A protein has these predicted regions:
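Catalytic alpha/beta active-site cores
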Residues: 1-93, 97-101, 107, 293-330
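General structural feature for long, well-ordered alpha-helical segments within catalytic domains
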Residues: 3-7, 42-49, 79-86, 114, ...
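Residue-identity detector for glycine
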Residues: 11-15, 22-23, 51, 57, ...
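Long alpha-helical, hydrophobic tracts
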Residues: 37, 58-193
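Electropositive, surface-exposed helix/loop patches at the edges of structured domains
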Residues: 56-58, 129-148, 210-233
């Protein structure tokens, strides 16, 4: 929830050492008409509380829910930028232990590149803005979209994310899901099964790392271009203040969180998977990307259209409804 002062205060009093925050991200994902002033004030209070406790020897970590709450597809760049903004807001208030969420989209190449760039680029901007003294963590979430009701399909989803996490090898945390996720509140037994499955996959891939292939390097390059473009625009619009810049960018549509429920999102940016399952920009709206970024995304989407021979809207509907819909040729 974007308004969590009482909840977090009670949690800390009960022994909780980390909590999720997001003055911008949780507002966009979970509220239709909540003012940024209210949600950011709440996040700033929690960050100040975290910093105050840190100074007194109680280590409290804050995690940006930079993509996890959305529950649909997103590009690594959109998620990374949102995480940077959330963590800068927290660092400004004195929080020292900061975590970033990452929800794999189930394309190994894009996800490995995204995870690596998320840590590197977030550190870059925190350092640049004067917050080099923070400790940064990563938390991989096992898919926050619609879970299959079929338990075997759900287990396959959990296993695939676990494999991505294992081959990335640098995340400090993972939010484990269960095969009952698509049916309702999981039982204690179902939670235990999810943990066993995750640990088994992690053990199988123990000691292995996904190599820096040409494909990973290419994906890393495009992610960095997209992130730097959006961050440059946000900093310019805020005259160096990331919070003011983000609010102005959202109003102008030069940054968007596609498919979010908030009325503060213009809704001109749309995303779709390409033929490999990687998430691309279908429409870039008002985001000031350079021509090479727009063309790269366009080519990837057009190739899928050519191969599948289906209407764009039907493919998009599949992408939003399932993790990866079965391919049925017309």
């Amino acid at each position: 929830t974007p308004i969590a002062r009482l909840l977090v205060t009670m949690g800390i009093a009960g022994g909780c050492t980390e909590f999720v925050m997001g003055g911008i991200s949780l507002n966009l994902c979970m509220e239709y008409d909540l003012s940024f002033q209210k949600s950011v004030y709440d996040a700033q209070y929690l960050a100040f509380l975290s910093g105050w406790l840190n100074e007194r020897g109680v280590k409290i970590a804050m995690e940006s829910d930079n993509a996890a709450a959305l529950g649909v597809i997103t590009t690594p760049s959109i998620s990374i930028v949102m995480g940077i903004i959330d963590l800068v807001i927290a660092a400004e208030q004195g929080a020292k232990y900061l975590a970033l969420a990452y929800v794999p989209m189930h394309n190994f190449i894009q996800d490995i590149a995204g995870l690596r760039q998320q840590r590197r680029l977030t550190k870059k901007y925190l350092d640049m803005l004067g917050y080099s003294d923070v400790t940064l963590y990563q938390d991989i979430h096992q898919w926050n979209g619609a879970f299959p009701e079929d338990r075997q399909k759900a287990n396959g989803l959990i296993a695939s994310v676990s494999a991505i996490a294992a081959l990335y090898g640098e995340a400090e945390q993972m939010m484990v899901k269960t095969a009952d996720e698509g049916m309702g509140v999981p039982t204690m037994e179902s939670n235990a099964e999810g943990l066993i499955l995750t640990r088994q996959v992690m053990n199988i891939f123990r000691g292995q790392r996904y190599p820096n292939s040409l494909e990973v390097l290419e994906e890393s390059k495009i992610i960095e271009l997209e992130v730097n473009c959006m961050m440059k625009n946000i900093l310019e619009m805020g005259d160096g203040d990331v919070l003011i810049g983000m609010v102005r960018a959202l109003k102008a549509g030069t940054y968007e969180f596609p498919y979010a429920v908030s009325k503060h999102v213009l809704g001109r940016v749309t995303l779709m998977r390409d033929n490999t399952g990687a998430v691309r920009f279908l429409h870039t709206g008002n985001v000031p990307f350079p021509p090479e970024v727009i063309e790269y995304n366009r080519e990837k989407v057009e190739l899928r259209k050519k191969i599948e021979g289906r209407e764009e809207m039907m493919m998009l509907a599949d992408d939003l409804r399932e993790v990866r819909a079965p391919l049925i040729f017309p």
